């Protein structure tokens, strides 16, 4: 099943130059036979050879021996899927895991409203504002900004509640013990 490409090759050279001996295309013949007959491990192989007579001598690359050659590619079209054990052992990037683990960021609006009943007015009002800003950022699609503002609203709400409890306890103690 030999392919006679010498005549096409001479046409590509334009009839000038040194014609190659007949055994110079052994590699191409072997690769063509191997790709036509074999299918290894359920994977299909591809092989492409472009031989056209429109190519001029300038388009052909030189291989260091004043003989032009053409590039040939052989590669896999399909690959076998990884086994489940290999997939589970693979380490994913931190951005991919954080996006999957954390869904919709929380705005802590209920906690901020609850903190408004504590007597630390500037802190709990700022927590309420940050919670509303977190909700607006989430509606605009800015997940990172919504997450950051939500965490800040949670921190300020907790601080407001704790300071409010401290103020309430001090007021009760001052009214009962010191009077």
Curated annotation (Swiss-Prot):
Per the record, GO CC terms? cytoplasmic vesicle membrane; endomembrane system; perinuclear region of cytoplasm; plasma membrane
Q: Which residues cross the membrane?
A: 158-178
GO biological-process terms attached to the record: cellular response to insulin stimulus; endosome to plasma membrane protein transport; glucose import in response to insulin stimulus; protein localization to plasma membrane
Alphabetically ordered keywords of this record: Cell membrane, Cytoplasm, Membrane, Transmembrane, Transmembrane helix
- Mind telling me which InterPro entries this protein's record contains? CD225/Dispanin (IPR051423), CD225/Dispanin_fam (IPR007593)
Query: Would the keyword Membrane be found if you checked this record's keyword annotation?
Result: yes
Q: Where in the cell is it found?
A: Cell membrane; Endomembrane system; Cytoplasm, Perinuclear region
User: Per the record, which residues fall in region Disordered?
Assistant: 1-47
This protein's major location comes to membrane
Topology in the membrane? Single-pass membrane protein
The lineage's top-level taxon is Eukaryota
Q: Which residues lie on this side of the membrane: Cytoplasmic?
A: 1-109, 131-157
* Chain segments annotated as coiled-coil in the UniProt record: none
Q: Write out the topological domains of type Extracellular.
A: 179
Intramembrane bits: 110-130
Question: What family, per the record?
Answer: Belongs to the CD225/Dispanin family.
Q: What does this protein do?
A: Regulates insulin-mediated adipose tissue glucose uptake and transport by modulation of SLC2A4 recycling.
**What's the protein name?**
Trafficking regulator of GLUT4 1
**Source gene?**
trarg1
């Amino acid at each position: 099943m030999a392919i006679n490409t010498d005549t096409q090759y001479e046409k590509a050279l334009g009839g000038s130059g040194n014609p190659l001996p007949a055994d110079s295309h052994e590699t191409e013949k072997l690769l063509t036979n191997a790709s036509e007959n074999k299918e290894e491990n359920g994977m299909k192989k591809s092989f492409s050879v472009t031989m056209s007579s429109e190519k001029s001598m300038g388009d052909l690359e030189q291989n260091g021996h004043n003989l032009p050659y053409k590039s040939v590619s052989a590669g896999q079209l399909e690959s076998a899927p990884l086994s489940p054990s290999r997939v589970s052992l693979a380490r994913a990037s931190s951005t991919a895991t954080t996006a999957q683990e954390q869904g919709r960021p929380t705005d802590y609006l209920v906690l901020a409203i609850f903190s408004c009943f504590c007597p630390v007015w500037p802190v709990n009002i700022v927590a309420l504002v940050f919670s509303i800003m977190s909700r607006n950022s989430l509606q605009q699609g800015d997940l990172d900004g919504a997450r950051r503002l939500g965490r800040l609203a949670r921190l300020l709400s907790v601080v407001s509640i704790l300071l409010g409890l401290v103020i309430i306890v001090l007021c009760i103690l001052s009214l009962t013990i010191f009077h």
